[in-house]
Amino acid sequence: MRVVFMGSPDFAAICLERLLESDNEVVGVVSQPDKPHKRSSKLIPTAVKKLAAERNIEVETPDKIKNGELLPFLEKTNPDCIVVVAYGKILPKYVLDFPKYGCVNIHGSLLPKYRGAAPIQFALLNGEKKTGITSMLMDEGLDTGDMLLKTEVEISDDDNFETLHDKMAAAGAENLVKTLSGLEKGEIKPEKQTGDSCYASLIDKEMRKIDFSAATEEIYNKIRAFSPVPTAFTTISGSIVKVYKAKRENGSFSGKPGDVVSETQLIVKTSDGAIRLCEIAPEGKRRMDDEAFLRGLRDKKGLACN
């Protein structure tokens, strides 16, 4: 099958790598434009563009695609199918309607649950034990197209965004190859999305702030959902502290939510117990363990997170 691949970040690059190993022919790639590095003005290509360049595949990086900008590229490459994995732009109707087999999207949830931009984070936030990949035929809605193939992925108690992302990317890559093969052979039939849906919105700063008046489990899930990026955070003595890793604490603890209840470890009172902030990064400093952080404080009395 002749395929144009549209994607941008690492997740998409892993899928493209697997696609290139398959019997399909990748005739072109579309990715987001290069963006300035955070600490310099140097333009950095996406992970997908880097991979395509290494494999000598023609790449388009249009600023806009709404008004036919991609049509000449599609007419030139003439794909049987367009594969879309975390591309980052909404596809207009002329793109959706172009290929024989339609536009196939790899989405990081078991649809219709967690439609939207952050399905992996929301699965962790909500303490799910299982999530997965859904391939679907794209329509003009947001993750509302007919489903093609689902792959389940188990979530372990110590998974964070990084580890679950990597498991999901590997599952997504295999799902993609199986989906294209099934479509071409007529072995996969599109299925309407049914049942309750929910939306995984973009992550904002307020969502990342830790509220210690919440339950321990809720706080634990928030920390792992945003680790290592964009990172959950709290404030200690007026300074922002990023939290990368936490551990639930057993036992009963006195004090009010947010109080630090140990002088040697950063154990913080919650609404129903306590949680240890094991690995942190104080504002402007490197990542460190909580014990090293506390050793560097002169006055530990009355310490609190808020």
Question: Model-found features: residue ranges?
Answer:
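Residue-level signal for inorganic ion chemistry
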Residues: G7, V29, A52, L176, ...
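Donor/substrate-binding cores of folate-linked one-carbon enzymes
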Residues: E21-E25, Q32, C81-A200, D204-E206
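Conserved beta-strand segments that form the floor/walls of ligand-binding pockets within enzyme
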Residues: E60, N105, L148, K242, ...
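An anion-binding loop in the catalytic cleft
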Residues: S213-N306
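Glycine-rich, highly charged phosphate/nucleotide-binding loops
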Residues: E60-L70
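N-terminal Rossmann-like dinucleotide-binding module
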Residues: M1-R39
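N-terminal beta-loop-helix "entrance" segment that forms/cooperates
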Residues: K35-R55
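Short amphipathic alpha-helix with an adjacent loop that forms part of the alpha/beta core around
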Residues: G68-N78
